From Swiss-Prot:
Domain Obg: 1-159
Subunit structure: Monomer.
Renumbered residue ranges of the record's region Disordered: 127-147
Name of the protein described by the UniProt record: GTPase Obg
Annotated organism of origin: Escherichia coli O7:K1 (strain IAI39 / ExPEC)
Chain positions recorded as Mg(2+) binding sites: 173, 193
Gene3D superfamilies named in the record: GTP1/OBG domain, P-loop containing nucleotide triphosphate hydrolases
Domain OBG-type G, first and last residues per copy: 160-333
Length: 390
């Protein structure tokens, strides 16, 4: 299936149903009073993370999602039916962004996690709500409010423990094929890898980690050169980055310059990503003598000002790969992911249900007061009849 990691969709929540103006009519009850019911609430639009999905390709074709409108109120104090909700399933790792404000609405990082992206409209009030001692036959009602409408940008970011960086043909795909069951395409030309891929590295029956391979970067990627930096976002959730360097490039380029290009592109994309733990890994050492490879790796590390430990491996022959993987596993165990507890704060809304309906009732009451006739005269027949019956 084609890998798609970005999609734009429109979500529209259902409008609230309108209130009803109705009066009770039964035999021998000529004036039964108001019995108009309230409308129903509009349906909501939800996002739900599903671990069985791995691409956003479905939302390249289906771009609009609309929840059901609430039904209008009816006579006999019947409340309208609430509109049905709409649930949009997305892969785990999807980030939801409101294109109108640029605000990140949420990150879908757990299977079954749900996120409200569009709230349905509130129901309108029927005329039963407006009856009072001075208004026995109210003909007022309120309409339901419109539901939320948003244009959303969905960004899929892979969930991996380890991310791989490097120039094209640095051996990233060969490495992931050597340590996992993933089989990305491998060839002797640049940009063989066109989309990110994941591989699970199993060290034993209990220990494993996930590694992500992204297309190679070249100079000017931040400005859109090559495949650009659009795939770097898949490394934002990684705990450690493996920077693969071809120790003896076949095209004759300088390994030091190549390494600096990767570092520069990381810093241009995100300072947070550039600050992540990054390990230097020299690949293709099988093409050189052991002493020559060690000497060259030391010279490159010194030129880069690298003072930490570095690794010499051959992804093709497996030399040094197992030791590197065990060190990565140890690092992951010693640096577990810290789950920040979400602060339990009240839901941020513009106004609450009770406030809205109370305001509607107060406005109607003010209108009734303005229209009230303080001077009683013979034309007020309804008032005379009412007083007589009491």
């Amino acid at each position: 299936m084609k890998f798609v990691d970005e999609a734009s969709i429109l979500v529209v929540a259902g409008d609230g149903g309108n209130g009803c103006v109705s009066f009770r009519r039964e035999k021998y009850i000529p004036k039964g009073g108001p019995d108009g019911g309230d409308g129903g609430d509009g349906g909501d639009v939800w996002m739900e993370a599903d671990e069985n999905l791995n691409t956003l390709i479905d939302y390249r074709f289906e771009k609009s999602f609309r929840a059901e409108r609430g039904q209008n109120g009816a006579s006999r104090d019947c409340t309208g039916k609430r509109g049905k909700d709409v649930t949009i399933k997305v892969p785990v790792g999807t980030r939801v962004i409101d294109q109108g404000t640029g605000e990140t609405m949420g990150d879908m990082t757990k299977h079954g996690q749900r996120l409200l992206v569009a709230k349905g409209g509130w129901h309108g009030l029927g005329n039963t709500r407006f009856k009072s001692s001075v208004n026995r036959t109210p003909r007022q009602k309120t309409n339901g409010t419109p539901g939320d409408k948003r244009e959303l940008l969905l960004e899929l970011m892979l969930l991996a423990d380890v991310g791989m960086l490097g120039m094209p043909n640095a051996g990233k795909s060969t490495f992931i094929r050597a340590v996992s069951a993933a089989k990305p395409k491998v060839a002797d030309y640049p940009f063989t890898t066109l989309v990110p891929s994941l591989g699970v590295v199993r060290m034993d029956n209990e220990k494993s980690f996930v590694v992500a391979d992204i297309p190679g970067l070249i100079e000017g990627a931040a400005e859109g050169a090559g495949l650009g930096i659009r795939f770097l976002k898949h490394l934002e959730r990684c705990r450690v980055l493996l920077h693969l360097i071809d120790i003896d490039p076949i095209d004759g380029t300088d390994p030091v310059k190549n390494a600096r290009i990767i570092i520069s592109e990381l810093e241009k994309y995100s300072q947070d990503l550039a600050a992540k733990p990054r390990w230097l890994v020299f690949n293709k050492i099988d093409l050189l003598d052991k002493a020559e490879a060690e000497e060259k790796a030391k010279a490159i590390a010194e030129a880069l000002g690298w003072e930490d430990k570095y690794y010499l491996i051959s992804a093709a022959s497996g030399l040094g790969v197992k030791d590197l993987c065990w060190d990565v596993m140890t690092f992951i165990i010693e640096n577990p992911v810290v789950q920040a507890e979400e602060a339990k704060q009240p839901e941020k809304v513009e106004f609450m249900w009770d406030d809205y309906h109370r305001q509607q009732l107060e406005e109607i009451a003010e209108e009734d007061d303005e229209d009230w006739d303080d001077d009683w005269d013979e034309d007020d027949e309804e008032g005379v009849e009412f007083i007589y019956k009491r």
